[in-house]
Amino acid sequence: MTKSIRFTKMHGAGNDYIYVNTMAYPIDNPEELSIAWSKPHTGIGSDGLVLIGSSDIADFSMHIYNADGSEAMMCGNASRCIGKYVYEAGLTQKNKVTLETLSGIKELQLKIEREEVTEVTVDMGMPAVGEMALEVEAGGEIYTGTVISMGNPHLVIFVDEMDQVGLASVGPLLECLPLFPDRTNVEFVQVLKPDEVRMRVWERGSGITQACGTGACATAVAGVVRGKTKRKTKVIMDGGPLTIEWDERSGKVFMTGGAVNVFEGFIKV
């Protein structure tokens, strides 16, 4: 027996996911659906599937499934999109929303103009800084990376010229290094100015994506601990910029950016 599920495709800085309100449309096989729906030619096309649900400890819950069906701990871009979704769908009237994720509760501050959410700031919590100058080998090259956790793992590598990075070939090798038994996200970063960097990302479970919110946060933290950037930095990704601030007093990382509704519809399962 088939049923129709309503979905909304949204993106944050080009990082696009399929969003489903599971309070209205329950889903019991998200891994399979994420794989099928993420395919651009035979599905909807996305970086994965995000389920919005109820929560006993926050306003809403978020579960993220990558394009390969694996479940992600956290996604900053998806968090911003959920902030826009729940407000504009009438699920909340608050401009400050709490979101339960696998990496803890996140607070979203919504900027609202004419009943539309134009910008969302996410309290991403405190980062965990691992090895600051880890040498790794991939594809016959030696890279020096900084290990950062934003609730999910990141390897941040600073380079002089972004255009010389073969992300499609080296990304999957670095993702699956034995040093990272659960695999890792990989960011290559070129410093443009003390408060501006360019970043490209290979996401664990999804490959090359237009943007990664937690990756932008990890990039900003790595820039500070490596003495390369200021605490407030614009991170420019293929899908657009995010403003990241690592607050010195609280130790928390704050991410600010937009969220966009692309289209919505029904799909049969």
UniProtKB/Swiss-Prot annotation:
UniProt keyword Nucleus present: no
Listed name of the protein: Diaminopimelate epimerase
Free-text function comment from the UniProt entry: Catalyzes the stereoinversion of LL-2,6-diaminopimelate (L,L-DAP) to meso-diaminopimelate (meso-DAP), a precursor of L-lysine and an essential component of the bacterial peptidoglycan.
Subunit structure: Homodimer.
Record-stated family: Belongs to the diaminopimelate epimerase family.
Principal location: cytoplasm
Cellular component terms (Gene Ontology): cytosol
Keywords attached to this entry: Amino-acid biosynthesis, Cytoplasm, Isomerase, Lysine biosynthesis
Organism classification: Bacteria, Pseudomonadati, Bacteroidota, Bacteroidia, Bacteroidales
Gene Ontology BP terms: lysine biosynthetic process via diaminopimelate
